[in-house]
Amino acid sequence: MDKFVIRTPRIQNSPKKKLGEKVYKQATIESLKRVVVIEDIKRWKTMLELPDQTKENLVAALQELKKKMPSREVLRSTRIGHAVNKMRRHSDPEVAGLAKEVYTEWKTFIEKHLDRPSIEVRSDPKTESFRKNAQKLLSEALELKMDHLLVENIERETFHLCSRLINGPYRRTVRALVFTLKHRAEIREQVKSGALPVGTFVQTHKK
């Protein structure tokens, strides 16, 4: 009678965490407070400044800004501090209170770290050229000037949803937005009046 050796797989016990052992969480460079993506700062600024903006969007923008500590140079070049300061006088107590927190934290930080610049992340010239062209197409479809805040807000929201890349999805989304704005007057008016939030409008056309 033949004999067979049956090998059973060894069960490897997962290493147990030692009591008191520190658990490290991996962080991306953009999650650090001192790392400031200029594009994000400008996007949040347009969200704060756009007329008839919803409370939810204002709170969302302020909460994101609260996670960052921009340098004096960034505050000056983007004027984001001015936009946040204006929100301190908002009629909604939650928006005004959150804006006050952000403004106070930034002011305190700047006073303590005058000589320590933050790390700035900017787009390259080629990317900016593509985006300017997209803004031109959007402004024509909206029948607004190219430097209108609504045009800027729509383009920045599109760029953000496309992972801040000039890629296929970005180009297709811009084309879809332009087509709708040109050929569907009722949606164009809803976007211009604020009845249709920019975020919702862009999200429904993302390709």
Curated annotation (Swiss-Prot):
Annotated Gene Ontology cellular component terms: nucleus
Keyword list, A-Z: Acetylation, Nucleus
Domain (TFIIS N-terminal): residue spans on this chain: 39-113
UniProt protein name: Transcription elongation factor A N-terminal and central domain-containing protein 2
PTM sites of type N-acetylmethionine: 1
Entry-linked PROSITE patterns: TFIIS_CENTRAL, TFIIS_N
SMART domains: TFS2N
Subcellular location: Nucleus
